[in-house]
UniProtKB/Swiss-Prot annotation:
This is Mediator of RNA polymerase II transcription subunit 6. It is found in: Nucleus. Component of the Mediator complex, a coactivator involved in the regulated transcription of nearly all RNA polymerase II-dependent genes. Mediator functions as a bridge to convey information from gene-specific regulatory proteins to the basal RNA polymerase II transcription machinery. Mediator is recruited to promoters by direct interactions with regulatory proteins and serves as a scaffold for the assembly of a functional preinitiation complex with RNA polymerase II and the general transcription factors. The keyword Ligase does not apply. It comes from Danio rerio (Zebrafish). The gene is med6. Component of the Mediator complex. One of its GO terms (cellular component) is core mediator complex. Coiled coil: none annotated. Residues 190-254 are annotated as: Disordered. Keywords: Activator, Nucleus, Transcription, Transcription regulation. GO terms for molecular function: transcription coactivator activity.
Length: 254
């Protein structure tokens, strides 16, 4: 298995020496940064040359090469150190920035790394959205494409089915059913069998009752809404004619 060099991925690591944290200040922060266990420090820099010559940091301007300087401080916890390439006493090229917060050293990301990380996060989110959308897509040759969401099935399962309330029957319906049952009984009367010991059962004829004309039962609403008929006018008394005797018969003269 190949090992990964930490120097190739310095943006994802940090370094701290807890022995220096209580005494850290602007005068010794560069010495703290130049510890041998610090992976961010380059030992071929001009700072090591000045340290070997036991000179001050002011002599860095007279050398050409990589150097580290204290760029900004905000005591007691924030220190910013810059790595730069010096080409002349007045011309330098920034290479990287490092910030120390409460004794922990981090490398500040460059603009290209920030843009790459943001673009990768956006593409990952878009790809996840497409994958999620495709999981709900369905296709059939006869139906085509449609969406099938799982939430709809769960809602249909959880949603209680409302039972329809049965309405009570009305008086008209009950009377109508009774009339139909009575009519069927008259059309198809039941046949009773009288059994005797040792003989076959003999059917007993049932006298069929004469059918009574069934008056149509009007709905109760019509009877309630129909106004009562006015009373009939009284009939005049019958005229009495006096009894007249029949006319006398006269003899016919020939």
């Amino acid at each position: 298995m190949a090992t990964v060099d930490l120097r190739d991925n310095l943006l994802g690591i940090s370094w701290v020496d807890s022995g220096w944290v209580p005494i850290l200040n602007p005068s010794n922060v560069l010495e703290y940064f130049s510890e041998r266990s610090n992976p961010f420090y380059d030992r071929t820099c001009n700072n090591e040359v000045v340290k070997m010559q036991r000179s001050t940091l002011d002599h860095l301007t007279q050398l050409v090469g990589v150097e580290y300087i204290l760029l900004h401080t905000q005591e007691p916890i924030l220190y910013i150190i810059r790595k730069q390439q010096r080409q002349s006493p007045t011309q330098v090229i920034p290479l990287a920035d490092y910030y120390i917060i409460a004794g922990v050293v981090y490398q500040a990301p460059d603009l290209g790394s920030v843009i790459s990380s943001r673009a990768l996060s956006a593409v990952h989110g878009i790809q996840s959205a497409f994958d999620e959308a495709m999981s709900f897509c369905r296709y059939h040759p006869s139906k085509g494409y449609w969406w099938h969401f799982k939430d709809q099935e769960e809602k249909e399962r959880v949603k209680p089915k409302s039972k329809r309330k049965e309405e009570p029957s009305s008086l008209f319906q009950r009377q109508r059913v009774d009339t139909l049952l009575l009519d069927l009984r008259n059309k198809f009367p039941p046949t009773f069998y009288q059994t005797k010991p040792g003989e076959k059962p003999v059917p007993v004829e049932v006298k069929k009752e004469p059918e009574v004309p069934v008056e149509t039962v009007k709905p109760q609403e019509e009877r309630e809404t129909k106004p009562p008929a006015p009373p009939a006018p009284p009939r005049p008394p019958p005229q009495t004619t006096p009894n007249k005797p029949p006319p006398e018969k006269r003899a016919r003269v020939q």
